[in-house]
Amino acid sequence: MKEPLLGGECDKAVASQLGLLDEIKTEPDNAQEYCHRQQSRTQENELKINAVFSESASQLTAGIQLSLASSGVNKMLPSVSTTAIQVSCAGCKKILQKGQTAYQRKGSAQLFCSIPCITEYISSASSPVPSKRTCSNCSKDILNPKDVISVQLEDTTSCKTFCSLSCLSSYEEKRKPFVTICTNSILTKCSMCQKTAIIQYEVKYQNVKHNLCSNACLSKFHSANNFIMNCCENCGTYCYTSSSLSHILQMEGQSHYFNSSKSITAYKQKPAKPLISVPCKPLKPSDEMIETTSDLGKTELFCSINCFSAYSKAKMESSSVSVVSVVHDTSTELLSPKKDTTPVISNIVSLADTDVALPIMNTDVLQDTVSSVTATADVIVDLSKSSPSEPSNAVASSSTEQPSVSPSSSVFSQHAIGSSTEVQKDNMKSMKISDELCHPKCTSKVQKVKGKSRSIKKSCCADFECLENSKKDVAFCYSCQLFCQKYFSCGRESFATHGTSNWKKTLEKFRKHEKSEMHLKSLEFWREYQFCDGAVSDDLSIHSKQIEGNKKYLKLIIENILFLGKQCLPLRGNDQSVSSVNKGNFLELLEMRAKDKGEETFRLMNSQVDFYNSTQIQSDIIEIIKTEMLQDIVNEINDSSAFSIICDETINSAMKEQLSICVRYPQKSSKAILIKERFLGFVDTEEMTGTHLHRTIKTYLQQIGVDMDKIHGQAYDSTTNLKIKFNKIAAEFKKEEPRALYIHCYAHFLDLSIIRFCKEVKELRSALKTLSSLFNTICMSGEMLANFRNIYRLSQNKTCKKHISQSCWTVHDRTLLSVIDSLPEIIETLEVIASHSSNTSFADELSHLLTLVSKFEFVFCLKFLYRVLSVTGILSKELQNKTIDIFSLSSKIEAILECLSSERNDVYFKTIWDGTEEICQKITCKGFKVEKPSLQKRRKIQKSVDLGNSDNMFFPTSTEEQYKINIYYQGLDTILQNLKLCFSEFDYCKIKQISELLFKWNEPLNETTAKHVQEFYKLDEDIIPELRFYRHYAKLNFVIDDSCINFVSLGCLFIQHGLHSNIPCLSKLLYIALSWPITSASTENSFSTLPRLKTYLCNTMGQEKLTGPALMAVEQELVNKLMEPERLNEIVEKFISQMKEI
């Protein structure tokens, strides 16, 4: 109710207000001022003010304020004198002070201190009392409204309330369906169509598993259960997400979309990294889905822009309504009046000391505003309805121009800041459907599922065709924002990432951005996704060709990695930049092969080289290759009847202790039995205790799928420092499987015996030290090394490079022979170089070395070492053979021992002595002096004939006797003692028992031994009848020399005569014997790859980064199998499947 004004006061008020009308500014100077003026008018129009009151010291004087009607007639309100009272705000209850302006609502006597107080008071008065909320999960009352989490789940129309995120997660786990994509081709009955077909999806919902055979059945299942279908509306492809539920979280009056409760927790964090573009994706991840909202408010999902365009074109062609009518209807709808919910303010009360004439405020309703929008085919237009926060009678109209075929070079977006004062119907142009373009509906809204929802609008601009509406009131480049951020690195381009709100020199910034490389790339990418009939019709064929091309290129990548791994070459180079002359083995080989494959492959290489050259992608491919190779080995192991493990210790470049694990097993073929020793990989060992090592080895073998019930042997590096640890490992394995015999490494024991032999005799140790100094001096000078090779014909093969390595002493016979035969010439060369050298220190070193090699003692020790090592070298080479077995090894060890024992007499010593004197005579003929041996009279020598008799202690009477006792006899006794110690401390009982049963068919059968073997190995049948048959059959049919019989040759006889099915128990014993590891040579071979694989090692890498390349370098036979077309296709498919799961 308006209060009436007195006649005289009304005239004064009218005169005072009309006098200030001329001071009102009616036209803005620029667009920014115009925008500010429009916003001010809108705010004033929402609050209609009617009267103003003024309070003096003694009374409240009512001022004047007009509510101007549409006719423009102003009515004056009289001043009303009142008694001085204390006034407070009806909203916030604050006391109104002197000079403060108060506001009064129309039809109400309550006063307010500000407009927000009025709005808040109206909202609290009009809104109903909040009802009592209950948590949908725990059923507890939610006392604090701020703790309420309202979530609209996908299969319900109403919202569910929760008291906390934990309750939301618990509720979600109870009811959400789990969708699993099936990769195995298993025929099962479909839960929807009831047909027996290959199942594509498994959906677990409410503890019930549903098998679905196709995308159509999946869509029906979702529809039947009222789920939001994550399926393409056009092609039906399932667009998978980490959770099949979609949540809408209401916070602060806004709707936020999340795919799970975990996403709600991670709200306002940085967005996830974009997925790597992977070729041949039959399934689309959710962040590549396109969500559109139709006119009716229905949400539709599409797997690609092409699917969206095809669906939109088909929908438009089927509709009988033209685009012009659509735009007209939309404009009409926007022009329709809305219900005004804005409070109307009746009075403004001024608490001033004196009466001040107030200006008349024009509160006429703002005229309808129209924003003209220009639409092209390059963007999707959103003519969304005005939000409740906009003026109630604001209208929007759209003008549409005929689109162009390609995106415009200038495509920017900005917030619409201006509105026309009248409807611009003259600018409306009819839009026809082009035969070459497929446009989406004008009212569609496009957004990413995981991204923020945003509408895309365009308004007319003189120089720039497209402008996008932004809530931030900033300008964006449409093409760069939509395409470039995901596929290119946009750096600090403001128009693509941050936008710009600084309108100074805006056109200049726009033109500069048009010429940038990022903008041109985004436009080029945009053109590939045009809504054309040709692109839609040829989409399947083009996509199929791209898939095949990408697969061929991926095969090329895998072949390169296999080849480089087989050759033990590093993939990466020191400088892999574009300008580098040598980019590394991988890039150089890839570029060369891509050129040979054709222009298309070369183009793919240039576009995807950074992707496949990344360390992570190469590691993923190597990991898949490693898995394939290990699976092949494990299949062979599990198909065999028995296997043994061979382990050695090593240290990688990160100084971490590792174990090299190999397996030995027999493999039956059509004509023979092959002995396979395969390398399985390196395993880190945190502790070097027996229990921990046993657990580490067993865990690794079980992880890769080895059947541990078939283990029948174990061998380890038996050096002195590791012997105790490996004995504990063997004991742990024998607790679980007593038949896993501990067979020591014979190669290591032979090496230990030779080392002790060379170190325990003083003269031999001194001679080897002099020999090492000689080779070190020769290698120091290239000229000296060339002279030695040319003069004495010492090839690199005859000169052992590892002369100072203890592990190479067993094969020093070749080196010793080279030095012995050429010693006079070596001494002569040293003399010449020492006399002509300008370096005095080097000359002194050569002179000292010349004195040492010219001694009789040095020559004698060389002759003696060669005589011993030349015999033990035969056994050392035999132990490196993978086909060696216990039976043949025992005879060879006995032969070595017999040979060395038989030479412990004066005859063989005299042979060495005479040979030494002959060489010294040759040196003397060259003009050099040889230092003769001297007799050490005070040294006691103990005879070896009777070690317990102290009377045998004597002094040698001659130099020859001294050399015979001190060097020759003592050296032979040392080597014989060590060999007997090493090869006699093992328990050969079980091994010899099987050897006797299989090889000694001409001797009487020992049934007690046979029964013991049967019980120990838990054979299923009685072994005695098989042995009786086998012995008679072998006598009549096996024509073979007893001296060359071994387990391998016996296995060939079993296959030739078909005895495996006749005597299964004996055949099993034969396979067990073939699996026994006599040596860990294969493990040593794996160690030889480490120096060549140093590129793959760094301080942060463990065995996972090393096992893959080492497998390719050691198991080259398996690498060749992986290069077959079928196996390559399997690796390609596994890599693609792995990339989808990222």
From Swiss-Prot:
Q: Does the keyword Zinc-finger apply?
A: yes
Q: Where is this region: Disordered?
A: 385-413
Q: Name one Pfam family in it.
A: DUF4371
**Low complexity biased stretches:** 397-413
MYM-type zinc fingers: which residues?
110-148, 160-203, 210-245, 300-331
Please classify the protein's predominant subcellular localization into one broad category: nucleus
Cell compartment(s), UniProt: Nucleus
| Record protein name field | Zinc finger MYM-type protein 1
Originating organism: Homo sapiens (Human)
